[in-house]
Amino acid sequence: MIHEQHIEMESDDLFITGALKHIVPGNQGRVLDGRRTPGYIESFDKESCMFIWRITAFEDKGKHWEIPVEEISNYQFYKHSTVLPEAEVEEIISTCQKFQTRLTIPVSEEAYSVTQELINLQERCATAWLKAHSAFLKNQKTIDLCANTGDPDLYSDLEQYMISEGLLALEQKTAEQYLLNPYSGEWIKGMKIVMAEAGMIAYDGYIPRTKDIFSGIGVKETRKKYIVARAAFLRAIFHLCGHQEVPLYRGMSSSVPLFETPCTLVSTTFSADVAKAFASVDDSSVCKSCYWVKFSYPVEHLFMTFYETKQFNERYKEQEAIIYYRKKLTF
C-alpha cells in the first residue's frame, strides 16, 4: 500500500453526489476518489467561481485545493448538508458561462525547434555549472535508476542552480503544486499554456479564470525561462551520469473507457510496483478500464523527476517522473 487509507470507511449511502447547491462554506464531504479523501468547503470566490477544498486526512491533511465549481460532481456531501437558494445557484451558473470558452494551442514543430535550440544552449551552461558547483558530482555520486529516493545533494544542486538563474520561487511553487494537485488553481495551467506556446505540448482546455495567472513571478517570459532552465538542468545531469533515456512505468485505473492521451504533461514512475498499485487489475475491481505499462523514454522529454525534486520525496514515495508526452507511445 503506497498511500494512506481509512481504517474504516463510511458508506457512500451517507452521502449525495455534489451539485452547485452544495457550494456552501462549511459543508463536509469527500472526494470521489478511490480512498474517499475527506474535507470540507472552506470558502467560495464568486469572481472566479472556484471553491477552496480543505483536506482533513491522509498525506495532504491541512492543505487545500482551489477547484472550479463545474467539478463539484467529483465530490460527495453528507445528505444533511446545507444547500444554496435556487437564485444563488442560478447566479453561479450565469457567472460560469464566461469561463466556458476553450483555448486550443496545437503542437507547433517550428516552435518546438526554437525551444530546443534554447534548451541546448542552456544545457551547455548547466553542464558547466554542475562541473564547477555540484555537490552531487563532487561526492562522486551518479543517478541510480533503481533508487527508491532522490538525493539531498542533487536537491541542493537544483536549488542553487535555480538561485543562480533567479528562478527558485518558480521551482518551489511548481514542484509543490504538482505534488499537491496539478489541477488545483491555475499555476500549472499557466505552465501548460506557456509550454504549448513553446511547442513542448499541446493545450486544449478552458481559458484562464483568474486575473493574476500571468502576473508577478508568473509572467510568460519568466515561465518560459524556467521551463528552459529546468529542462537544461535535467538533461545535463542525466547526460553527465551517462543516461540518454530512462525506463519508466505508468499505471492507471478509470471509471470510464480508455481514451487517447493528448500531448500534455503525464505522470509516470520509475517503479514497477508503484505503477501496478495505480492499476486495479484484480477481479474485484469496479473500474471500466486500467493498464500498466513499461517504456523507455528520452531524457529530453523529462520535466521533473524525484531524483532532483525534494518535494517528490516528502509526503509521497512514488518515484515520480513528469514527462512531456508527445504521442510517441500509445496509452
Enumerate the predicted regions with their spans.
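Basic/aromatic-rich interaction segments and small domains that mediate binding to polyanionic partners
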Residues: P25-V69
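Mono-ADP-ribosyltransferase
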Residues: I2-E8, D12-D13, A19-N27, S43, ...
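Amphipathic alpha-helical interaction segments
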Residues: I52, E59-K61, S73, L137, ...
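Repeat-associated, polar segments at repeat-unit boundaries in modular proteins
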Residues: E66-V83
